[in-house]
Amino acid sequence: MNVIHSAWQNGCKKLEFLGSSCIYPRMAPQPMKESCLLTSELEKTNEAYALAKISGLKYCEFLNRQYGTDYISVMPTNLYGPNDNYHPTHSHVVPALIRRFHEAKVNG
């Protein structure tokens, strides 16, 4: 929120806010749609983080509406990189797929 507010105070016309897929309800139907936002209970284990991300997303929307800024929110889900978790049962989607592709190639 501080970065968004500072950007607005300093005349920044464009901003990209990074959200998270955790802003959607715990039991959102799949495939998930943007319209699911705020329709039911969030996952309790990351609710505070999700609420902070929802606040940022909404703040960008309000500034756009009221002041004509071009602040967008994107949800960069399924990213991977250095130090990612490639555990066979406890990893995210992309690292799990990379591991499985590698194992399939190695094992024929």
Model-derived features: where do they sit?
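Conserved active-site region of classical short-chain dehydrogenase/reductase
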Residues: 1-5, 58, 95
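Conserved Rossmann-fold NAD(P)-dependent oxidoreductase catalytic core, especially the SDR/UDP-sugar
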Residues: 1-46, 72
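NAD(P)-dependent short-chain dehydrogenase/reductase
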Residues: 27-36, 61-108
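Active-site loop-to-helix junction immediately N-terminal to the catalytic Tyr of the SDR YXXXK motif
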Residues: 42-48, 62, 88
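Active-site YXXXK catalytic motif of short-chain dehydrogenase/reductase
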Residues: 49, 53
